[in-house]
Amino acid sequence: MIGTMRIGIGLPAAVPGADMARLGSFAAQAEQAGFESVGVIDRLVYDNLDPLIALAAAAACTSRIGLISTVVNVNWRANPRLLAKQISSVVRVSGGRFTAGLGMGGWPADYEASDIAPNGQGKRFAAALAVMDEAWRSPGERPSVVLGGLAPAAIARSAAPVSDGWVAPLFGFEVLQQGIAAARDAWARSGRAGLPRVITARYFSLGPQADAVADAYLEHYYGAEYFAPARSDTLTSAGGVRAELARLAGAGCTDVVLYPCSGDLDQVGRLSEAVGDAAVP
């Protein structure tokens, strides 16, 4: 930890070419290294694992480490009651370790593949959350929920009773700062005690050819339109990791998940060394 900010590492579940059969070993090494959580991201039309299945695999190979989604995209999953069941299943098999970051989903291809119109997503998301909230009435089934989104209405929604806070985007420090201020304001206006949980994430690549590995992965994942902003916040040196963690903690983040650009198991050890004592609870 840095101050009170918890440091997690992402699973390589969205890294094309990664050996997904070793995902459990990756999670076990992360737990042994002292990270607070393992995280997943979500897309449909891409070479990645379903995030909930990836987290269930991680849960089976660990006993203490937290599980975080940043985020599971709700709106192109047509049945929110089914999604609530899947999420509560991860809660139960993990012994309550799952923090469910939930969002609407922004990739047009995912909506096209799901035959769901991209308009009206705010209302769709709110309706789905209501269904899921009702489904999580039994003891031991409700996850800690944090809500993602960048629009003012989405950030305001993070103060809803179902939510424990806000999931910030993977890059953009100014956007993060503005979002934290807006989330805290919404929290106060809603009469919530204390401050919201704020979860953010960054990409990292460490070791030989770190920059080349990061370039190749981010170009493949984001394409030309979003490559530059994603790459600008990607961490490719130990000093860069430590400096960014200090900056995120100073901004008010409660959790950060660092996502690898490679599926190599050595990324766990390299990141642990880069973070140093801050990674040890």
Positions of the model-derived regions?
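Active-site-adjacent structural elements that line small-molecule/cofactor binding pockets in enzymes
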Residues: 1-281
